[in-house]
Amino acid sequence: MNYLEGVGSKKGGGGIASESQFNLQRRKEVESLLSKGENVPYTFQDEKDDQVRSNPYIYKNHSGKLVCKLCNTMHMSWSSVERHLGGKKHGLNVLRRGISIEKSSLGREGQTTHDFRQQQKIIEAKQSLKNNGTIPVCKIATVKNPKNGSVGLAIQVNYSSEVKENSVDSDDKAKVPPLIRIVSGLELSDTKQKGKKFLVIAYEPFENIAIELPPNEILFSENNDMDNNNDGVDELNKKCTFWDAISKLYYVQFFFKQAEQEQADV
């Protein structure tokens, strides 16, 4: 330790260190031991790509104080940094950062592959199912939106009845939810049904259910009481259906655009 420039020192002789100088030197030594001699860069410095650091989120700001870029915290000493690195907040942020990087590395191509495989599983499960001839219990009620007076339908289908053996061979097949589809009369072979429209509810291995609908356009935005079905194959299934896999109850609800609304749109 050099005390030549201390108070009361003489040229050529060891000076007397003041208490403040001694404390400053001791803090520097402690900081060096805690940081293991690592050179902490400033936030405005460009890091080298080949530089490997044990604490890559710790930097010095313009005033020389230690900061954690990940958690946006400032620390007066390296001992405070050590406590922060071992704390819950920094650990959670590192975990979130890792998950974010993993998702971004998956990319759009990886997500598309995952969705394709999921659809293939559903198709294979449906192909292996066989119709058992069971007609589920269906309840239909007319509902009215108190906000604008729109009239709609609320449908409950009970799929909790027993099915024949070997109709469902695995849990993966049971996870395939029911679905709905609007079928126009033009798609039917019966010429008497050409001007009609039907709602078809399908859930293998049960029989399909067909419900005749009025010609009015369906409103998706009015279906506020129904939780979104994220497993739905399209907008109709996502916004107008709810599948309770535990009770095996399937709910469908939507409203129709009234004549006044259709004229206003025109």
From Swiss-Prot:
Cellular component aspect of the GO annotation:
catalytic step 2 spliceosome; nucleus; Prp19 complex; spliceosomal complex; U2 snRNP; U2-type prespliceosome
Keywords attached to this entry: Metal-binding, mRNA processing, mRNA splicing, Nucleus, Spliceosome, Zinc, Zinc-finger
Family that this chain belongs to: Belongs to the SF3A2 family.
Q: Where are the zinc fingers (Matrin-type)?
A: 66-96
Q: Name the chain's protein.
A: Pre-mRNA-splicing factor PRP11
Question: Where is the protein found, in the record's own terms?
Answer: Nucleus
Q: What is its main location?
A: nucleus
Q: Which Gene3D superfamilies match?
A: 2.60.40.2690
Could you describe the subunit structure of this protein? Belongs to the CWC complex (or CEF1-associated complex), a spliceosome sub-complex reminiscent of a late-stage spliceosome composed of the U2, U5 and U6 snRNAs and at least BUD13, BUD31, BRR2, CDC40, CEF1, CLF1, CUS1, CWC2, CWC15, CWC21, CWC22, CWC23, CWC24, CWC25, CWC27, ECM2, HSH155, IST3, ISY1, LEA1, MSL1, NTC20, PRP8, PRP9, PRP11, PRP19, PRP21, PRP22, PRP45, PRP46, SLU7, SMB1, SMD1, SMD2, SMD3, SMX2, SMX3, SNT309, SNU114, SPP2, SYF1, SYF2, RSE1 and YJU2. Interacts with CUS2.
The species this protein belongs to is Saccharomyces cerevisiae (strain ATCC 204508 / S288c) (Baker's yeast)
> What function does the entry list?
mRNA splicing factors, PRP9, PRP11, and PRP21, are necessary for addition of the U2 snRNP to the pre-mRNA in an early step of spliceosome assembly.
